[in-house]
Amino acid sequence: MKTALKIAYVGTNFYGSQAQPGLPTVESELRKALEEAGAIKLGTKIAMAGRTDAGVHALGQVVAFEQADPKLTAPRIINSKLPKDLWAYARAEVPDDFDPRRHATSREYRYILYAPDVIERRLKECSSRFLGTHDFTNFSSVEAGKYPVRTVTRLDIAKRGDFYIIDIEADSFLWNMVRKIVTALRLVGENKRPDGWIEKMFDPEYREGIPPAAPGGLYLSRVNYDGIAFEEDEYARQRAYQRMLNSFEWHHTIAEIYKEFKDAMK
């Protein structure tokens, strides 16, 4: 049997999820922690449900590996070896052939967009056009050999003050697909692109490059599977909650200072 873990991380200090020589990544820090805890043997492959780029976060990333000792794969044990911005909080026993990427039925991302000048009605009208099966060549960064057709099953937008909370679910995603969709939504919402532009962008013969939205607003919220039951580690969750509460208080204070400095410089 293998072990699957649900992990979360604040991606600000990581150079993405995949290992890169000489750089701090989610995979490299997790591997070091698992090896130090005795949960895996040296060189054991660690598979992830999805790749996240530098600066992108995750709340529901899933990793799987062949365990050396099941008792040592408990989230609370692994977390004692991890940096404070990366933690595990749930665990499942999975079959030897389980692949967290290939066996996922869908993935869900959330983007938190600060956009006080967006017209809410246009943003929400535009969002429905992404639903269904489309060619997302113009809404992704080109990867050689990647089939560009994807099916978006859900795209919800909720307003929270000057922020828009954008939730998107699909069978799978192309590189930078979510962040480029967010850019497109914003362009339409700010009246910088006309009606019908989204449909035009779905034509792979038409090419218009748009930049991806900033990575810091994006996180992988959930990966869905059939027949996999994760058991949450309540102690690990509570420790993570307390760390997040402390960080929230600090960053909320800094945000207020930035606001006062901004107002003073008007």
UniProtKB/Swiss-Prot annotation:
Pfam families with a match to the protein in the record: PseudoU_synth_1
InterPro entries noted in UniProt: PsdUridine_synth_cat_dom_sf, PsdUridine_synth_TruA, PsdUridine_synth_TruA_a/b_dom, PsdUridine_synth_TruA_C, TruA/RsuA/RluB/E/F_N
Physiological role: Formation of pseudouridine at positions 38, 39 and 40 in the anticodon stem and loop of transfer RNAs.
Protein name: tRNA pseudouridine synthase A
Active site (UniProt): D53 (nucleophile)
Entry keyword Nucleus: no
Signal peptide: none
Keywords, alphabetical: Isomerase, tRNA processing
Catalytic activity entry: uridine(38/39/40) in tRNA = pseudouridine(38/39/40) in tRNA
Gene: truA
Homology family: Belongs to the tRNA pseudouridine synthase TruA family.
UniProt-listed Enzyme Commission number(s): 5.4.99.12
Domain of life, per lineage: Archaea
GO molecular function: RNA binding; tRNA pseudouridine(38-40) synthase activity
Residues that bind substrate: Y109
GO annotation, biological process: tRNA pseudouridine synthesis
